[in-house]
């Protein structure tokens, strides 16, 4: 099952409409989150955060929530737009993610994006 989580109701409505047209809506669930809470309890095998982390007010809080939603062996792919996110800002995002209990396990090439693939780090450090 695919869980779609977004702060903007309009984005969820657009996604749900497209899913219905493609006859995929029975495989999907849609959740509106709060600005500081993902508001989802399900554990998943894969989390995709595409071109949105730079819009999060508190990246530490965001990344602290992700490991609890990830199944053992699960992965998280973060992609950020190069047009909005500098190399330095993306490096800072990677550091925050790592201190939140994630380990970089790859940096795939995604067009126009900075990207990193993460898994859970069993030896979680606390972010200061």
Tell where the protein language model's regions lie, with residue ranges:
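Class I SAM-dependent methyltransferase SAM/SAH-binding core
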Residues: 1-38
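Core SAM-dependent methyltransferase catalytic element
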Residues: 100-128
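A short glycine-rich, Lys/Arg-flanked "PGG" loop and its adjoining helix->strand segment in the class I
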Residues: 60-75
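A short SAM/SAH-binding and catalytic strip from SAM-dependent methyltransferases
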Residues: 45-59
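A short hydrophobic/small-residue beta-strand
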Residues: 2, 76-77
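Short helix-capping segments at alpha-helix termini
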Residues: 20-25, 72-73, 101
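Conserved class I S-adenosyl-L-methionine
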Residues: 77-106
């Amino acid at each position: 099952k695919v869980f779609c989580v977004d702060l903007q109701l309009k984005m969820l409505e657009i996604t749900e409409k497209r899913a219905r047209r493609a006859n995929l809506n029975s495989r999907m669930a849609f959740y509106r989150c709060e600005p500081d809470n993902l508001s989802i309890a399900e554990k998943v095998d894969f989390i995709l955060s595409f071109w949105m982390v730079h819009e999060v007010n508190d990246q530490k809080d965001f990344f602290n929530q992700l490991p609890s939603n990830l199944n053992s062996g699960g992965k998280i792919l973060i992609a950020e737009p190069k047009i909005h996110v500098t190399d330095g800002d993306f490096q800072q995002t990677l550091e925050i993610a790592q201190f939140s209990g994630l380990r970089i396990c790859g940096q795939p090439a995604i067009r126009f994006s900075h990207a990193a693939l993460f898994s859970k780090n069993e030896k979680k450090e606390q972010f200061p």
